[in-house]
């Protein structure tokens, strides 16, 4: 009889007596995996990641000093599956670190069958060709993949074996041709063995071997010896072993000589690769090599270039390795024949009995594939695990297996990994593939050229042409196709990790071989290969290791009772108890997990009648019932069985030290199985496996609702089903009426039919919003137009020619080659286009040297008319000319015309000035030359300069009087009438208009005199004109400038203060650790897994007391975001590690929305999340929506504002001890009783967006700032970009983000008036410090922030777009004397929009919300202060800049045009302001050492038109771009009434019942009575928080949470959903956490596996449902009857004082006795006498009677009983207290 023993079953490991489990439900995190890896490393054991994957940790030290760790179980699995299933298998030996040693040989030895010794010798011979020494690994493999194929028959015996490289070949570049030049690197080991293993001197002489330093290929790094830290490393000894291995595989004699000759030839040929080698040396080398290789020297010397020789060396080396492998395979095959014939044993030591089986029978193969390259191993592994488009994953999906797609970030990383090594995976389409193809083709050409030139029949030709007639087939023949192997085998993974990044030399100094450990290094390896996601995905969906055809399955297991067909198989599977996903019956195949498969195979082996099947049996204990499988109950070798040992550490904080324990382990059952099932949407109570009850992609809807056993709805009204349609009339405020009237006044000319039919605006409210938008855009345009008009054109109206006048100094500023201005006779000219022209007909050339000195000059003394021509009628001779007071500096520039002109030129013409010069110069006229009237007067008075003003014209007679003085008043030079000249002489600098007019008037009677006076005056006007007075100094021209200057000063002052503020807030003081309780709110919408994980991990890793922070994630609907593969809530729950089977009830609450949308449902999850050693409690609220929403794409979605209100309203009700809705009651229960913190302890709320990661010290800095300043109500930190270089849209935002914080917000914060605390990173104070007055959670803020009917344009922009800014505005409005701060030390990173469309959408929201918030800011009473001297008013002005951004851009464009076109004066002030603005900002960067932002500033300046013009214009016009909905349509506004058509059933507040926590806790036997709000203050708690007996783990008394680990003594029920839904019952399930067993039956702890196993006869699961007589709790609306629990011994809700850490013994003789019963006479539930006595005795034993009053004792007793005693009960209590005191 054939041996039927299963080696695998005998050798199985793990706990026995456990049934093979279904899908793994525990979530694997990096930390849990890291801890497991550390433990197995210390124990030198493997770790099973999932059924087909094992992890080991090895170093060269563990490999050298002992056998490296391998998983023999994995090899046994592969063997069992191969022989039993007759399917090929492949074990991938992957390496996650470059320093991991090879485990190929040790893994082969772990197979449960004999391996022929020749195979090991073959590996010894081949590995020196593939490995080399590197600084990080003394034996680094350089091949892509090396496979050992073991061929087995179906009995599991080895029939053949072979070695092969993959077609990816060997990395000859890094291993030979171009080894790194750093110390520690060597080439392939074989070359060093060659140089030290020559057996005889003759052989060494023949080969011409020298020292390694003589060879270019070996000398690059300067390292020639093996590492010194290897105690037994010696090239000589290794070379001897290598030579012996070659002999063992048949390489000896001539084959060996050819082999070593080729190796030596390659070494020498490497010396030709140096481009600096001389020609003679090159010839000599080629001569030597040709003799060794058997080829003509000219072939290498002349037919091959240096590049060709490079290619030839690499190709020939690979060919040589292929030849060695082929010889090895021949030797292995020969030994296998000898073994089969009985001539030899597998170990080669002797003969054995010949085997009876034949090799010609059916066979299977197991390929052990070593993949040392990290990139390749990662790519092929992740592809097979996460890629659902191919391989077995695709087969599963096609067959109907429910496979959840991998996360988008995982898929992106997988795709990147595959693209990096595409050619090795057969992907030749990308750039890497094309490059590889080019290299292969080039190699083939070179090798073929040399092969044909080689000796016929020589060794070289045989190497290159191994198969005659096929040419060069290197890389194909004798190698395996890696993608084909992966696609045709069942894959198993054996992955090696390395414990540290330390060098191997450092490991040698360690005290033990397992001392090396770096959590960061190992964690990086785990995260790089996505092993946590790997484990979660495989264990949850894909961990099927066996699959059968339907008929095959039925046939194989027919002997075990399996029937034919799918129905028969499914029935048999259920009979076996495989109902939890262990077996899946698909369309065509049956899929089995490892535990179930092995259980079936074990049972099959036990069947005697099954002996005819050729399957080995196993020796299993018949009493084990097939459970002794070596697998844990859940089918995983790593994950612990369900249930977790409780913690008895006695800590008063009691946060578990376990990892990622979700609500599934810590929340107990709920309600009565006889209570009516929930009305909550069935899709929200989806019991499908592993779906969190959230449905598939957020839209699964199962029509199976039952309201009560009869199918009737239990309430009086269903707001979801009612279809009321009605008109509502709504009061409109006076302000709204004024605005509507104003809008119609401006848009009356646009008839509504035109908008309705042409504009396609069918709804009246949409048309009204469009009109409002049009008016707003018009007003904004008007404001911008006014600003632009005021700055640019208003001054022109007041002073039309102000830009056509220049002073002499201003003219002098134009002295460039392209800016050539001059003045002449009171006029200014721009002769830039003229001065280069050759305009002289004399020998004087127009050159730059001649002309440029005149730029900016006054040319009165250079170009002047003949005196007799310009002053006619005065008898001036043509020879008369004036002597100029200022001598011309450049004589070549003097243009003297007339009599003294050059006779040979046109200047000799007396009329040249008027005929030639004047017409030409007028073409370049710019304006008047102006003189300050003060300067004219000053020079006239002080210097006696004879010039004067006539009207506004200035005339200077200095040259006239100088000439007279020189010529002693000669008559020919005294040509002006003395009455005229004397006026200028006697009144220098004065306005002589009246005097001169008087002289003219007096001369009228004397014709001769009048003629001379008039001719003299005309001469003065034509020859002595200097310009005009500077009118720009007049009030008319300066008033506008003064106004602008005033605003400029204000702006500059603000900029300066901003600068100072930025410097002021640059301190980096490290505050002391804070201890305030903080809620970290994270609203999640459509973010991706990567963003969510970053956000949650960053919050968990905050350097803050983990017990005092709570992560509260609010998922805004069940929505699949763009790029995601599953809804956002599922992503969040996956990250947090929540059990996918957890399906809490959907509880109603009131949302922010119109009409019936106010009714919403939510689910609450809680637990602990661990990241990098930080364990933080979390609360997840998923808004799942109403029943009617489940078919929609966004069920439950109400917006971010609703998510904020949900938490704010909850905390408001907690603060006021007000009645709560069912969802809030559940939240309170989870926080208070499960997490163990009284919600009222939380003092701050940190709001963080789901795509934001917070720096570690940020929270502590924010809390510290608030603790130091009690006036701070809100505070934010700096938000920077994490994707700053992702695209051009992100690059233009970097500078803006930085400067908006360090200038804008720092400036606002200086005065405590930050106007927008960003929702992505802001912390609010919940209540004031002194009196506990609510702030963020105040009624006023919540009321205004929670407006439901958002039906106007203003409200839409406030509440739908800018909720963060509006919330800040509301806080400022209601708490104006509180501060709103910014601190730059608290930092976070967020993802900016990476595309233009997203940036447009974001800025539309920001800009429009800013505009509409300005309206709200204007209404604040404290806005302007006294005479507008208020910093908030200054902040308002700063924000006003948003509206005038387009005007700013237009003005800057205008400035650029003016400067570029030289059409006006240079705007010095404007340019100086801009320089100051950006200069100060750059100075901020420099002082803060943020050098990179200077570059970002330049990018921002380039993109300034986008920010200041494009985005604002787009935003302004899209103010009405909303989804308006159809439930509420405003059909008209008249007077103070607004008419609304409601096509909606409306919202009935009764659909969301409210109940005080105390009542709810009492009714449901829950701990934590709080008392009312008044009671809170009456008992003396006005300024502090009440901390009763079990409210918090931080109170004096330990809390009563199930997290405390109290065994089975104290389990609490989660809140029952109140009326009108009665008890929202969970459907019975074996796995769900919500069940209906009463407390008396649920005594065992959810955390205790031991109790579960002991009570296995009673219950297979701690979640088992038991019937009970417990009555339903009275609903909140007083409906229904109260059923007494007759004869029920219910478990009382025990006090933490009584059951934690041994503080006191159980209360009374029976701690499980009920404390409540129904009193038929009094008609209410109360404590009976026994319970009161017990409570009194308990309290009196614990208190100090010397310090406690009787009143306090009474209060403690009532607190212990969790009820208030009145009437007879109170009298009994008082009497009993007295009696007990007497007896003490």
Swiss-Prot record:
Residues 1-25 are annotated as: Disordered. It is found in: Cell membrane. Highly expressed in hyphal bodies, conidia and during appressorium formation. GO terms for molecular function: ATP binding; chitin synthase activity; cytoskeletal motor activity. InterPro entries: Chitin_synth (IPR004835), Cyt_B5-like_heme/steroid-bd (IPR001199), Cyt_B5-like_heme/steroid_sf (IPR036400), DEK_C (IPR014876), Myosin_head_motor_dom-like (IPR001609), Nucleotide-diphossugar_trans (IPR029044), P-loop_NTPase (IPR027417). PROSITE patterns: DEK_C. Polymerizes chitin, a structural polymer of the cell wall and septum, by transferring the sugar moiety of UDP-GlcNAc to the non-reducing end of the growing chitin polymer. Contributes to the production of conidia and the ability of fungal conidia to germinate. Involved in the fungal cell wall integrity and the ability of conidia to withstand biophysical pressure. Required for appressorium formation and evasion of insect cellular and/or humoral defenses, promoting the fungal dimorphic transition to the production of hyphal bodies that occurs within hosts, and ultimately to virulence. Belongs to the chitin synthase family. Class VII subfamily. This is Chitin synthase VII.
